[in-house]
């Protein structure tokens, strides 16, 4: 019986007679995706607008009821908090000057590092609604801008704080402000909407339902300052982000044309967020992948794999990797852009996450047809993959194992022989000792494919001797396979039993020699093996 759920997900995606060929191309496990997102520092989902000291010095001093900067900073604080009764009175006054002055004070409070008093602001009765009301003051663009800044910083907080801004009705007004004649107001509205969309899939969908995309895309048609373009493409990437559930594709796909030319902007931040957006849009079924391909972005994405900033390389690689999870024709589009040489270069990256993603991408190429496997061979990638399989961090070795096993699954006899000649058997045998059941199965399947070829050769040449049995024994693979007959995973022990019975005969097993478990190294220890066996580093 197979184990239900995502534990089986990658193993089903394995081109083998006993497994489902329709699912051979692996999509990233949800759990792994979430971990990557949590660790990713290159892209922030929320940003707080904090004025620099220089900007604060250059601010105009308010007159007619306003306060000098020093007065604002030194204002007597309310007992137990930072919001004074004067600030509250001024915000609700009928004087535009006092309204602006008070709004600036709130903005300064919320721009303080590192812990702005967001809760105190939103818990002051009527204040958030008042700032939303100020957004409508078309006759006073400065008040609009300052109010938008306040609300942006509130929305940069946690989900509850963001929800307060939404419930006050700010989102439709912010979307209207994207068409403001004042660029400062436009940019602050973009920033606020990006923070709200970046909070959760629910907030993202609400912003999309409010029809943000047309006015947001319209911003890109203007000659904007760089900060505006940066904020707009970052907001756009937040609208495309999320998997549970993903955004409705029809609502975000109109941005593909804009993203295609943003890939040619020289600014690193713009490039990075455009690539992240494309990686989100391509992370899904083949029809989404096709839409991304049809936008004409593939060649440029491949070029960006060689960018000198990892902030760009990471999302470009993610997008390329997602595209090759498609069918063979879609994968070929990437191959036709000369991607393999760039991927080979990334296999030697000092950044482990890049190396791992490159292996994952290659594993989906080797899940293709034999011609595509041959292009990987011709690009001389397998020596690097086998080296990674022997020496890299475990999370990277796992992806390299998929790349090699996929090639043994769909490859020709000559292609499999080539992998054996490169020395793939020993590192595959070494993986049989790790505690990760899925990777043990991947290694077993790779070895089974090799043994099956050896059996065919033995029959063809009449020798009756499978040449690969000896190689597996020399790599202590037989000892490990024998032990796997007592594995707790039913599929593993059944596979191990079948391999022993079919390819190695039925030798008596000394059950008294049971290997110990080294939990610190996440592997089994075989006393009869003189050579050390590498364990995984989870």
UniProtKB/Swiss-Prot annotation:
Coiled-coil portions: none
Bias (Basic and acidic residues): 20-41
Sites bearing Phosphothreonine, chain numbering: 3
Organism this protein belongs to: Rattus norvegicus
One BP term from GO: postsynapse to nucleus signaling pathway
Region (NLS binding site (major)): 149-241
Domain IBB: 1-57
Inducing factors: Injection of 6-hydroxydopamine into the ascending medial forebrain bundle causes the formation of lesions and leads to up-regulation of KPNA1 in the denervated striatum in a time-dependent manner, reaching a maximum two weeks post-lesion.
Post-translational modification: Polyubiquitinated in the presence of RAG1 (in vitro).
Stated role: Functions in nuclear protein import as an adapter protein for nuclear receptor KPNB1. Binds specifically and directly to substrates containing either a simple or bipartite NLS motif. Docking of the importin/substrate complex to the nuclear pore complex (NPC) is mediated by KPNB1 through binding to nucleoporin FxFG repeats and the complex is subsequently translocated through the pore by an energy requiring, Ran-dependent mechanism.
Protein name: Importin subunit alpha-5
Localization annotation: Cytoplasm; Nucleus
Tagged with keyword rRNA-binding: no
Stretch list, region NLS binding site (minor): 318-406
Family annotation (PANTHER family): IMPORTIN ALPHA
Motif (Nuclear localization signal): 42-51
Disulfide cysteine pairs (residue numbers): none
Annotated ARM repeat ranges: 77-117, 118-161, 162-206, 207-245, 246-290, 291-330, 331-372, 373-412, 413-457, 460-504
Tissues in which the UniProt entry reports expression: Expressed significantly in the heart, kidney, placenta, pancreas and spleen with lower levels detected in the brain, liver and skeletal muscle.
Region entry Disordered, spans: 1-41
Region Binding to RAG1, annotated ranges: 245-437
Positions of modified residues (N-acetylmethionine): 1
Keyword line: Acetylation, Cytoplasm, Nucleus, Phosphoprotein, Protein transport, Repeat, Transport, Ubl conjugation
Subunit structure: Heterodimer; with KPNB1. Interacts with APEX1 (via its N-terminus). Interacts with CTNNBL1 (via its N-terminal). Interacts with AICDA (via its NLS). Interacts with ANP32E and ZIC3. Interacts with SNAI1 (via zinc fingers). Interacts with NSMF; the interaction occurs in a calcium-independent manner after synaptic NMDA receptor stimulation and is required for nuclear import of NSMF but is competed by CABP1. Interacts with DCAF8. Interacts with ITSN1 isoform 2. Interacts with TALDO1.
Residues recorded with modification Phosphoserine: 63
Main localization (coarse): cytoplasm
Gene Ontology molecular function: any one: nuclear import signal receptor activity
